[in-house]
């Protein structure tokens, strides 16, 4: 896929770049909300997406910031924390997916990383009848806010590196506010924030595939 056309307002439009991969007879589609300073070229998210494709799930790797915005964010580090902006664009992307003839019959799941996890939670709360499941990798669910956490109904899995204590605490606290009965936090033994240790990203991909496989029916 080349570009997605997202209309932000009556007189404003933004073009976002994304990569859409659809295996044969997919069981659902996973939209990736990338985290701080990351995008569709992230090797970690590409790895997870490929594993999900192998498991029969379509994937959409998306840049939630334009190239100009990404350049600005690399200098200011502000837009990556603008959860309102990121979630608005993610919601528009979900609507695009549900109206696209190649994907409109697929159940939707969200995979959020870092600040992208907060955007995924906001989008899931807004589109509760559309989003079927969420997986967060090293996410910042606290940035979504308590009210959003209480509003999310989709089954939600938080994956956090065992050796990432600050993010572990943030995820454990966020989980307490979630009202959905299907919620879980899994600590990946020996993993740090980026899951760069051997075999740890494979564990993330495997757990994500199982979670989505259970709820994207």
Pin down the residues of each PLM region:
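Serine-hydrolase catalytic machinery in alpha/beta-hydrolase-like enzymes
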Residues: 7-103, 199, 203
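Alpha/beta-hydrolase fold nucleophile elbow
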Residues: 102-114
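Active-site loop->helix "elbow" adjoining a glycine-rich segment at hydrolase catalytic centers
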Residues: 114-117, 163
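A conserved short beta-strand
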Residues: 129-141
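Short beta-strand/loop motif that positions the catalytic acidic residue
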Residues: 152, 158-160
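Conserved alpha/beta-hydrolase "acid-adjacent" motif
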Residues: 165-170
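Catalytic histidine neighborhood in serine/cysteine hydrolases
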Residues: 178-194
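Post-His helix in hydrolase/transferase enzymes
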Residues: 196-210
């Amino acid at each position: 896929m080349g570009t997605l056309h997202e209309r932000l307002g009556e007189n404003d439009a933004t073009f976002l770049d994304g990569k859409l991969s659809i295996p044969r007879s997919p069981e659902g589609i996973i939209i990736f909300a990338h985290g701080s300073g990351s995008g569709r070229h992230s090797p970690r998210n590409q790895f997870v997406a490929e594993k999900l494709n192998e498991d029969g799930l379509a994937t959409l790797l998306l840049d939630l910031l334009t190239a100009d915005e990404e350049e600005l964010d690399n200098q200011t580090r502000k837009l990556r924390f603008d959860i309102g902006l990121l979630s608005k664009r993610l919601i528009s992307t979900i609507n695009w997916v549900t109206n696209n003839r190649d994907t409109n019959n697929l159940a939707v799941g969200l995979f959020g990383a870092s600040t992208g996890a907060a955007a995924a939670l906001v989008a899931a709360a807004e589109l509760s009848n559309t989003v079927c499941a969420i997986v967060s990798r090293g996410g910042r669910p606290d940035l979504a806010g308590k009210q959003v956490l209480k509003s999310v109904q989709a089954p939600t899995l938080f994956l956090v590196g065992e050796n990432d204590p600050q993010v572990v605490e943030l995820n454990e606290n966020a989980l307490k506010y979630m009202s959905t009965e299907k919620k879980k936090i899994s600590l990946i033994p020996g993993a740090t924030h980026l899951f760069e240790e051997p075999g740890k990203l494979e564990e993330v991909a495997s757990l994500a595939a199982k979670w989505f496989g259970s709820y994207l029916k």
